[in-house]
Amino acid sequence: RGLGDVYKRQRLSSIKAAYNLGANAWVLNAGADSWTLEMADGAVMNGDSQEHIKEAIQVMSAYCDVLGVRTFPKLVDRDEDYNEIMFNKVKELSSVPVVSLESATLHPLQSFADLITIAEKTGYTPGTKPEKKVKVVMTWAPHPRRLPQAVPNSFAQWFSKVDWVDFTVVQPKGLELDPKFTDGATIAYDQDEALKDADFVYAKNWSSFENYGQPNDGDKDWEVTMDKMNL
């Protein structure tokens, strides 16, 4: 079996997983290890792009049994990013199953790994009902650069639906995530109060969904300190 990957920093864990399953894996960084790809349908190929994504993905998927793809948002046009134009184009053109190694809005493998880790750490047995729910808090934290929403979107999407977890998302006003991913979670704005008695704290930065792509790196009060971890 062969797994072809188009992505960057996710590579080691995905390659290891492929090897564990008895598959061969190789990596192609689009634009670095290959020609620059043209995305637009019907484009005249007389610009800077040397190859069209239509031909590239069709050929790559012919060589693979599974195609792992990682894409990133531009954080400029929310509709463009949240419509997952790049990732959906790959799915449309591929003749084999496509696995998301992260897209413009979601990072499902990361959230799956996080869920497994927390279940292992708590000793939770799937299918059972714990005496007390595990309190998991995802808190916004400052960062010097504006970061995508894919990781927190997926984390919220998964943990808000887990019946053995009491899940809270806490952030400054104006940095709420897309409600379709946080539905079922407790939404809070007081970090100290939210962190009280937490079993797990997931500190993550994300740029604004409402004022799309805008950072909020000035809130140093939102740094997760040891004092806050001990609340």
Protein language model annotation of sequence segments:
Residues K129-E131, S160-V162, K228-L231:
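Short, conserved loop/helix-junction motifs that constitute active-site signature segments
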Residues K180-L231:
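Rossmann-like adenosine-cofactor binding region
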Residues E51-H52, N83-E84, A150-S154, A185, ...:
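Charged helix-capping and loop-helix junction motifs
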Residues S14-A119:
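Phosphate/diphosphate ligand-binding glycine-rich loop within oxidoreductases
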